[in-house]
UniProtKB/Swiss-Prot annotation:
Belongs to the cytochrome b family. A ubiquinone binds at H201. Component of the ubiquinol-cytochrome c reductase complex (complex III or cytochrome b-c1 complex) that is part of the mitochondrial respiratory chain. The b-c1 complex mediates electron transfer from ubiquinol to cytochrome c. Contributes to the generation of a proton gradient across the mitochondrial membrane that is then used for ATP synthesis. Pfam families: Cytochrom_B_C (PF00032), Cytochrome_B (PF00033). This is Cytochrome b. It is found in: Mitochondrion inner membrane. Heme b b562 binds at H83, H182. Heme b b566 binds at H97, H196. GO terms for cellular component: mitochondrial inner membrane; respiratory chain complex III. It comes from the Eukaryota. The cytochrome bc1 complex contains 11 subunits: 3 respiratory subunits (MT-CYB, CYC1 and UQCRFS1), 2 core proteins (UQCRC1 and UQCRC2) and 6 low-molecular weight proteins (UQCRH/QCR6, UQCRB/QCR7, UQCRQ/QCR8, UQCR10/QCR9, UQCR11/QCR10 and a cleavage product of UQCRFS1). This cytochrome bc1 complex then forms a dimer. One of its GO terms (biological process) is mitochondrial electron transport, ubiquinol to cytochrome c.
Length: 382
């Protein structure tokens, strides 16, 4: 009798995706983040589901309902802390996953990469609408400031903003629809993840060398299931430590004050994972220009496959490009720091220089470095 997992229509799909999947024999720990992101998504959906059972999306009771979850619901404090810090873990894994893709040339799987960028944008949208739900000061003012950016769109801008608000300001209608968006988007993300994996399994994984790994493949199970399990244990350890010991470390103290439309907080800033984009937005003194730069900061990822000039896929054997990659990493950390600082000198000029460098590195310097390295590697006989 043949094995059930190889014949049953449903089991067959699971088998080809997670058990008998041929995987390169030399993929490093940087390839763990895909599975970690899957686990993060499951954690967020489950904790979110239990939070939604007790949350009320009404301006009068939203803040109180979150306090009620933390005080009166069995393990409500834990569910809420896991959900809030789970978002931080999600973005940490996302940034590392994208960084891995850039470093090792995974973006040359164009369909997988493009779906990945759409996924990144969808997760960012989900996190933004989710941050509004507790209806604290930073929730309210964050929603007001970011939705207001759409008014920079010529002609239809102000109409569009009022349409999204469902009125003339961020109010009950806005909160209700943001809750609806926050509930539906994770399921859309799940569908996109399946498409992401579908495209990935068409080509198979890349590997650190950037060389075609077809000649040396090993089954996913048990080799990479056990490796992913180790990554999972480490991530759960970090997440639980955060949620148990310092759950509010990454949050904003202003969000412990109920939303008040009459009182603006001194420094409006998003969660840490949006600070780099927020810094780029603020570095341009023009409203429409800032919005376009904000969009470009993420959408620039879509043109990375077109900017690949090197004959080698990975940066593993390309020292000049490696230096530029780590400059880009340091630059993003600088932007993250600047995004959390007040709008005053020297932070303004640092933010502007870091924003220029961010785009220059991706669009100009890295493609040039690829061409230079190719030229240096060409045999030059007399």
């Amino acid at each position: 009798m043949t094995n059930l997992r190889k014949t049953h229509p449903l089991m067959k799909i699971i088998n080809h995706s997670f058990i008998d999947l041929p995987a390169p024999s030399n993929i490093s720990a940087w390839w763990n983040f895909g599975s970690l992101l899957g686990i993060c998504l499951i954690i967020q959906i489950l904790t979110g589901l239990f939070l939604a059972m007790h949350y009320t999306s009404d301006t009068l009771t939203a803040f109180s309902s979150v306090a009620h979850i933390c005080r009166d619901v069995n393990y409500g404090w834990l569910i809420r802390n896991l959900h809030a810090n789970g978002a931080s873990m999600f973005f940490m894994c996302l940034f590392l996953h994208v960084g891995r893709g850039i470093y090792y040339g995974s973006y040359l799987f164009k369909e997988t990469w493009n779906i990945g960028v759409i996924l990144l944008l969808t997760v960012m949208a989900t996190a933004f609408v989710g941050y509004v739900l507790p209806w604290g000061q930073m929730s309210f003012w964050g929603a007001t400031v970011i939705t207001n950016l759409l008014s920079a769109i010529p002609y239809i801008g102000s109409t569009l903003v009022e349409w999204i608000w469902g009125g003339f300001s961020v109010d009950k209608a806005t909160l209700t629809r943001f809750f609806a968006f926050h509930f539906i988007l994770p399921f859309i993300i799940m569908a996109l993840v399946i498409v992401h994996l579908l495209f990935l399994h068409e080509t198979g994984s890349s590997n650190p060398t950037g060389i075609n790994p077809d000649s040396d493949k090993i089954p996913f199970h048990p080799y990479y299931t056990i490796k992913d399990a180790l990554g999972l244990i480490l991530m759960i350890l970090i997440l639980m430590s955060l949620a148990m010991f310092s759950p509010d470390m990454l949050g904003d103290p202003d969000n412990f004050t109920p939303a008040n439309p009459l009182n603006t907080p001194p420094h409006i800033k998003p969660e840490w994972y949006f600070l780099f984009a927020y810094a780029i937005l603020r570095s341009i003194p023009n409203k429409l220009g800032g919005v376009l730069a904000l969009l470009a900061s993420i959408l620039v990822l879509l043109i990375i496959p077109l900017l690949h000039t090197s004959k080698q896929r990975s940066l593993m054997f390309r020292p000049i490009s490696q230096v530029l990659f780590w400059m880009l990493t340091a630059n993003l950390l600088t932007l993250t720091w600047i995004g959390g600082q007040p709008v005053e000198q020297p932070f303004i000029i640092i933010g502007q220089l870091a924003s220029i460098l961010y785009f220059s590195l991706i669009i100009i310097f890295m493609p040039l470095a690829g061409m230079l390295e190719d030229y240096m590697l060409e045999p030059k006989f007399p």
